[in-house]
A protein has these predicted regions:
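Short, flexible loop segments at boundaries between secondary-structure elements
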Residues: 167-174, 215-253
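N-terminal nucleotide/polyanion-binding subdomain common to many enzyme families
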Residues: 2-117, 123
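A short helix->loop->beta-strand "cap" motif at the edges of active sites that frequently abuts
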Residues: 63, 135, 214-217
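A transmembrane-helix-recognition feature enriched in membrane-embedded lipid enzymes
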Residues: 37, 99-106, 235-236, 240-285
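Short glycine-rich anion-binding loops that position phosphate/pyrophosphate groups of nucleotides
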Residues: 70-73, 100, 198-203, 225-226
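Short Gly/Thr/Asp-enriched flexible loops that form oxyanion-binding sites at enzyme active sites
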Residues: 204-213
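Conserved beta-alpha
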Residues: 100-185, 189-190
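Proline-aspartate-enriched helix->loop->beta-strand connector
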Residues: 186-200, 216
Length: 285
């Protein structure tokens, strides 16, 4: 600890750093934290920065879309008409892929392991916040009964939050009876946060197609996240995600459905990856 010399002017003494107000993370973004990889834009954000964005939007009653990119979405995007609309509407695009984190490091970008950011990385902090602040949280997705089961389990753990789940098994065509009923149920619930888990690209297309009919809420496509909350799927240990081998856990759990995603689709990204490497080498000259 600093000791003031005898007779020194107290006004000139350096301040005690421990007395200074500390913030757990920066509240201002740096320009270099929005980067382009494989032709698409992503935000290098910590989980706590995502939650700060969510909290601010809820407080302001502001609609905001938080999308995410991984290898699967980067493969689907140029092959799925209409999917890009969701990313054009998004205020934040999380980076949900440890291999992509490693790739951005290779390109010399300002990425770190903690920039891997998706629902499973901040779920506990999110639900604690929702519980404390009394948020209304709605989930649309999953098989019949799964969303309701997840909502029931989460409500037992976080009674301060109002949590509801709606099945994702409905006709999502605009103007259909099923879609109209779901939109009416969403508006009636008036969520602060809306999770949509229908799998890529259906969830992205549904949000983009219906954005004007959705309430002013924070909206996030989250895939099978609530299958984990309902206990119908087992999430990989988080250390596997940090090491970039979570895909192996999921592949062995469901090889028939995921073989193409993990063993075929990445090969189609080699061309754009080489393009990024060439551009990075050109910048360093």
């Amino acid at each position: 600890m600093y000791q003031e010399p005898h007779g020194a002017d107290a006004a000139l003494a350096p301040p005690d750093r421990r007395a200074r107000e500390r913030r757990p993370f920066r509240q201002q973004r740096r320009p270099e934290e929005r980067v382009r990889i494989l032709g698409e834009t992503v935000d290098l954000m910590r989980p706590e920065e995502v939650l700060l964005h969510v909290e601010r939007c809820v407080e302001a009653g502001q609609r905001s879309i938080i999308a995410n990119h991984n290898l699967h979405s980067l493969y689907l995007l140029p092959r799925t008409p209409g999917m890009r609309r969701l990313y054009d509407l998004a205020d934040v695009v999380e980076l949900d892929s440890t291999p992509l984190i490693h790739f951005t490091r290779l390109l010399g970008l300002h990425s770190r392991p903690f920039h891997r950011c998706t629902y499973l990385d901040w779920r506990d902090q999110f639900w604690s916040m929702a519980n404390r602040l009394g948020w209304r949280v709605l989930y649309v997705g999953g098989a019949d009964g799964v969303a309701a089961m997840a909502a029931e389990r989460l409500s037992a753990r976080y009674p301060g939050a109002a949590i509801k789940g709606l099945s994702g098994y409905f006709d999502a065509t605009q103007g259909s009876l099923g879609n109209t009923a779901i939109l009416a149920a969403v508006r009636e619930f008036k969520p602060n946060v809306l999770f949509v888990g229908m799998g890529m690209p259906r969830q992205e297309l549904w949000i983009a197609d219906n954005i004007e009919a959705l309430p002013r809420a924070v909206i996030l496509p989250v895939g099978a996240a609530f299958d984990y909350e309902a206990g119908v799927q087992k999430a990989a240990p988080r250390w596997m995600g940090r090491l970039g081998v979570e895909w192996l856990f999921r592949l062995f759990a469901d090889p028939k459905r995921l073989f193409s995603r993990y063993c075929v689709e990445p090969w189609f990204l080699i061309g754009p990856a080489f393009g990024d490497v060439r551009e990075a080498m050109r910048r360093k000259r």
